[in-house]
Amino acid sequence: MNPLKRSLESSSQEHEAGKQKLQKRECQDFTPRRYQLDVYEVAMRRNTIAMLDTGAGKTMIAVMLIKEFGKINRTKNAGKVIIFLAPTVQLVTQQCEVIEIHTDFEVEQYYGAKGVDQWTGPRWQEQISKYQVMVMTPQVFLQALRNAFLILDMVSLMIFDECHHATGNHPYTRIMKEFYHKSEHKPSVFGMTASPVIRKGISSHLDCEGQFCELENLLDAKIYTVSDREEIEFCVPSAKEMCRYYDSKPVCFEDLSEELGVLCSKYDALITELQNKRSDMYKDADDITKESKRRLSKSIAKICYCLDDVGLICASEATKICIERGQEKGWLKEVVDATDQQTDANGSRLFAENSALHMKFFEEALHLIDKRLQQGIDMLLNSESGCVEAAKTGYISPKLYELIQIFHSFSNSRHARCLIFVDRKITARVIDRMIKKIGHLAHFTVSFLTGGRSSVDALTPKMQKDTLDSFRSGKVNLLFTTDVAEEGIHVPECSCVIRFDLPRTTRSYVQSRGRARQEDSQYILMIERGNVKQNDLISAIVRSETSMVKIASSRESGNLSPGFVPNEEINEYHVGTTGAKVTADSSISIVYRYCEKLPQDKCYSPKPTFEFTHHDDGYVCTLALPPSAVLQILVGPKARNMHKAKQLVCLDACKKLHELGALDDHLCLSVEDPVPEIVSKNKGTGIGTTKRKELHGTTRIHAWSGNWVSKKTALKLQSYKMNFVCDQAGQIYSEFVLLIDATLPDEVATLEIDLYLHDKMVKTSVSSCGLLELDAQQMEQAKLFQGLLFNGLFGKLFTRSKVPNAPREFILNKEDTFVWNTASVYLLLPTNPSFDSNVCINWSVIDAAATAVKLMRRIYSENKRELLGIFDSDQNVGDLIHLANKSCKANSLKDMVVLAVHTGKIYTALDITELSGDSAFDGASDKKECKFRTFAEYFKKKYGIVLRHPSQPLLVLKPSHNPHNLLSSKFRDEGNVVENMSNGTPVVNKTSNRVHMPPELLIPLDLPVEILRSFYLFPALMYRIESLTLASQLRSEIGYSDSNISSFLILEAITTLRCSEDFSMERLELLGDSVLKYAVSCHLFLKFPNKDEGQLSSIRCHMICNATLYKLGIERNVQGYVRDAAFDPRRWLAPGQLSIRPSPCECPVKSEVVTDDIHIIDDKAIVLGKACDKGHRWMCSKTIADCVEAIIGAYYAGGGLRAAMAVLKWLGIGAEIEEDLIVQAILSASVQTYLPKDNVFEMLEAKLGYSFSVKGLLVEALTHPSQQELGAKYCYERLEFLGDAVLDILLTRYLFNSHKDTNEGELTDLRSASVNNENFAQVAVKHNFHHFLQHSSGLLLDQITEYVNRLEGSSMDKVELLSDGLPKGPKVLGDIVESIAGAILLDTKLDLDVVWGIFEPLLSPIVTPENLELPPYRELIEWCGKHGYFVGINCRDQGDTVVATLDVQLKEVLLVRQGFSKKRKDAKAHASSLLLKDLEEKGLIIPKNASKTEQFEKHCGSTNPFNNLHVDAMDTQTPKPTKEKNAADSRNISDPLLGKPLHVIVKTSKGGPRIALYELCKKLQWPMPTMESEKVQPSFSSVCSSPGGSSQKATPQAFAFASTITLHIPNADVISLTGDGRADKKSSQDSAALFLLYELQRRGTLQLQEV
């Protein structure tokens, strides 16, 4: 075999390889043929147009050039790129893949669908620096050159694929004429074509030479082809050309064509009559009518064409296609697109009526056609003889019959690959359907391929690609296509090309023939027998090709064409700074694009209008732009024809738009960047979102800071008395005084707060007592008292060295070893009771504690542990009990507070036992084995202590306990195991342990138990005081002096939900959001009177978005004040207290304050809010933005708009409202608007109860943008922008103040239900505002009329109307309500109270929690989530309609419903409403007579053990099921699943089994299992050591919990089993869940993996 001849198999493999995207590839080598090398060498010497046969490898020559030029670019480091241009997207993609495979360059493709038209200069520069080869459509390159994003100086090589397109006004032509021939530094040019002749053919040698020269001159290149064609003819498969002749039509259906014409005229008249019946004469309605008639005419033309060309059956199929398209409302989409309207077709009566007429026409037309067809036509086509009969009767045309015969002649049909070229898209579609009906061709797979986007007969780009891929792979045998597949499409396996419709040009002939790439392939021309015209056409084309090849190969290489001589005058406008330019040719599209960016709605699209004036020697065009444009009227220069006049006036307009700033210096539409500094600094992923996690520090409280505690001199400190009053008689709490070296804010100094203990409440009050002086000795005693009590109760008094076997150290042993933290310094000292503001510190108690500290120092200094028995006596005297430092009577021990010298723990003595040191250590234990015989032996071996009085009785002590969160009533039951018998609900509560201890190890502290009680209140109390002080500190930083802005409001604003307080920032955030929106809207409205609503909205969006608020908050250190973690009393530290739960700082920062670059993390497992010991904590970026809004809301709630504006100023948000701008805006409205002659608005003013001072504001508020077509210079959109913010703040303020006890979630729902366009639309209809709307749109009138009729004729409420799938109200109705609100606000000079007084009755009844209706989809999701069900969702497109299928698997039945709508959201709402009705019918949905929150909380709020699992997931291990529990107590056991078991990973940490079970049920759509937990009596616990090491006889817990789990497997089984008993309810539920998982594993449902 000749090595030059590549097999078709290798060619196919090359193409398939080209389809693979390799991220980092090694370029594939190929061996070029001799003629390819020849062309390559010529192209390296000069600009060349390679004229080679299709399939000859022109692209590979281009690849060789790319390699060489790329190498040069790299060597010279010139930074130049190579541009490869291809005329279609398919070719761009195909060629890009080939270049990627065969080169090592970075290659990218560019076309319009990628959005490159919207790219900016920096984006293009990024592409240039990243890629060396850029493959693109010529229009993309042309536009980038015109915008000066790319310049030819940066291009080293331009490749033109299918360069014969460079004629007329093609982008190839524009690139060369506008840029290349004017450039000083021209890149090299390489063109590729199989036919340089673009016209029908060539008439002579001179004509051919002229067309060659024209192309050469334009591309500045020389045509080159191979003179010796032997190698090409050998290497490139050449299709065998043949003609198939068909007979003339035996039957002409002229009478049927006439009948169809008459029918079309009839319906044309009906459409006209339909329009004449309308009372209005709106232009858009006229446009719809005209377009509808035009479409009707086009449809009948298609049907008649099919009737004449392919026969009666195909005409019937064409009619059916029209009917199907009408059913999908495809024709309506065409009408909408053609008239540049964006109206929802369902929203216009005119659309519906026209649609009905079209459908009736098609049905009648089909009836006329089908009655000519005999019964059983489908059976007729199942045989060859039937097809012959069909041809004779005209059912199929002879031409189509001959095509069928060709198909029938194919051998090895399963591998046949045939392209059939037709002229029209409808032909491809109907023949495709026809062939599928023919039985003896059923072994073929048939499809069609059509291009373009303007027709509904065309395929989308994706469908085109999929169809071509199917044809290439052999899934499709017969592909009917238009000329879209003529050029460049690589199908190496194509064995036959049929020209069902003859080619019209030499280029079409050559290109289509070149698609037949297989060896021995065929190229079949179908010609009517005896048709001289067709024969002459083919003969001329063949002669043209022969002459073209001959002339091209015989031209001498030295015979260069003359240089390019421009034969047209190019009018253009240049921008000197960038080099961008616009030509007269491109100016029209720019003007249209500019108008498209102007404000518009569904019933009005701004467009330019052109008027032409004829003069003797030409035309003058007057351009009128919409009133919202910066330029309205422009008269252009005179031109020779109307088109040129239109171009020139648009060119002048582009120049003016650039001068006025509407076009930027790149002649792109100006996109305003209102806050560029914000945008530039906010670059990053997820700024202001919950996805972004950042590390921030905590702001110190200035009032707490200081080093005064270390001074050895007398001090004067501010004193604040703390008084505690319990609501239970006999419960006494000692008074205390807070001493601090700063003056606390008044609200803190007068604080009153309720602290919630388990079974009681303590009212706490703080009062200022002025300065109090302490001498140096008192300071020392006070510090010892505080250090002893807080460490002895909540911490530890001993530390152990890291040195092995080193003795413990007493932390108060040396003054210099225990340093107080200067960040938080204060003293809490007990006082004697007093009834005035005087403070009388109880120094006797303080001195006693200090004495105990000194005693402990003596005991633990210099290893003098023998001093333990300081007080010694050989005999017990009477009822004396020997303590560590004294003896006392037994009856005085009750409630004595003591300190254990060996553990450093503080206890309260309860009783004397009968046990002694000599008693058996395990005497009260059921434990079989024990290490110690007696208590005395235990203390000797454990602590090295020899009891001096082993015979004296042991004391029963109550140990100190951990502090609790007492700030909220919801925490009062935290940590207890008792049963609340009032409601029968078991509440977890740990029973207090009782400790047995020898008295001689105890030091009495001589302080009453009342003082000890007060100490347990301090963690919660001081946490609240610290928080309020921090909030007050932030208030001071803001600097607005208003006593109404309380610290409590500020505290609420900086507290997140994660804190689990009774309050959070959510409500204030909602209010602040509305306030911010209102303030910024007013500011922008007044400051920019010439900006339209779209521009104002864009600026507002930038100013109030979370990214901006985040940036401003960071600049003001708001993040340091945010409270983002729940109060953990065990980690709270008093001054002088050592932490027993440290959290060492491992953060990537050195200082406490994060001042450098913000650290970001993507770890989803990161714990938010929890601070390390230096105060660093991870926080969501959005939290900071939310806090900013909440602070604004707090100031508005406390001090009104003036206070909120002060916060905005402090933040740096420019939202000032100047009085003179208000006056100017009112004056402008009064000047530019006009009043109707009869004042029709008096009735509206009467409805409003308000008379406008400036009537023009009301006129503007009711003027629709469509009025601008009649000359109006204004519309309601700016006032709508203002009114939107007005109604938002008014309704939010009302809801905030009216529902103070409503939680933040429900408040958000209330606002959403109140502030929305549908609600406002109903208000407009209720008060007949629509009667006063000034507009010029028939479509809008139809929409409003239909909506009003539906609303008035329905008894359903708003939610039912929406959820039933009916369209929402026209947006314009809600808009005018907002614009009226904006007009009144402006007329009253921004008096919100007046506006509310007018609108409150208009908006009534305003939604309340009692009648709040959640959106159906939201309600369904929440209900299912609460009850343990999952919602299956599947959405698909069906024509222009979205079909949403939702299903809910209940325990016994699967509920499935479908919803339909134009939008996915509305379709899901429709389906959800139907499912909710089903659930209600089954009695599962609660009647809607209460708020949603109350319903859910009451009926299913906290019963689901699988809710909030992440809260319970802790690092505690979940035991495996015991062996005796593996057997399940179940009924009807069967394997619920078939197939391979699911792999389930279960974490053994707390919550892990429940999470795994939840994920399993969600995946399988099983209802969540139910849990029932009950008390169980555990075994008696053994005697054990306390954490401090003391011996204790542990009292058994009152009970533990065991949980029973029940799983309903749909249509299969019910499994019920009980887990092991656990100490708390959640752990017992984990045990039950784990048992169930193991049971499912036993059944083969899953395979468990524990981690």
From Swiss-Prot:
GO terms for biological process: siRNA processing. ATP binds at residues 52-59. Gene3D superfamilies: 3.30.160.20, Dicer dimerisation domain, P-loop containing nucleotide triphosphate hydrolases, paz domain, Ribonuclease III domain. Residues 879-1006 form the PAZ domain. GO terms for cellular component: cytoplasm; nucleus. It comes from the Eukaryota. The record marks 1371 as: Important for activity. Mg(2+) binds at residues 1280, 1375, 1378. It is found in: Nucleus. SMART domains: DEXDc (SM00487), HELICc (SM00490), PAZ (SM00949), RIBOc (SM00535). Its cofactor is Mg(2+); Mn(2+). Its main location: nucleus. GO terms for molecular function: ATP binding; helicase activity; metal ion binding; ribonuclease III activity; RNA binding. Residues 587-677 form the Dicer dsRNA-binding fold domain. Residues 1-25 are annotated as: Disordered. Its EC number is 3.1.26.-. Residues 39-214 form the Helicase ATP-binding domain. May interact with ARGONAUTE1 or PINHEAD through their common PAZ domains. This is Endoribonuclease Dicer homolog 3a. It comes from Oryza sativa subsp. japonica. The gene is DCL3A.
